[in-house]
Amino acid sequence: PLLAHFIAKFPQVNLSVLNGNSRGVEVALQEHRIELGLVEGIFRLPNLKYTLFLQDELVAVVHVNSKLNIQEEITPAELPNIPLVLRERGSGTLDVFERALSQHNLKLSSLNVLMYLGGTESIKLFLEHTDCMGIVSIRSVHKELVAGTLRVVEIKGIPMLREFNFVKLQGQE
């Protein structure tokens, strides 16, 4: 709805939307293939200017019909025993999750990652048909939480907060 409102308010603006992970967006800016990007995560390249757009939280979710015996809250020590589906390398989502793990001396390599996928919608579909847990934005699963098809699993002591930033080349108006 955000883009639809933008186009309604500014019909004279020619807008093309490309989808990619945060690192890909930063590379596209540096190569002058795009003028403005929206990135997640913790990247900070000195030749790019980042402007905060919104704050977000990542959460662990499972499908309500999953056969995983997971309580509403788990400890970080339980994570290696749980099959996971995660975003792909280069995504801000994965970087934020890895940083949160490192605060508990956990590494991604110690976890049972079944699959890395290129987008949140793919993760949600995968969760419908598998017994595993995914890490996604709380904003991206609002409908599923309201509908009761997914449920949040709290990972005790691992807050996964992140920012979305508009990003452009330094010195660009």
Located regions from the model:
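Well-formed, non-transmembrane alpha-helical positions, independent of function
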Residues: 5, 27-28, 52, 75-78, ...
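Hydrophobic hinge/microswitch elements
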Residues: 21-26, 30-34, 39-40, 102, ...
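A late-sequence structural motif
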Residues: 122, 153-173
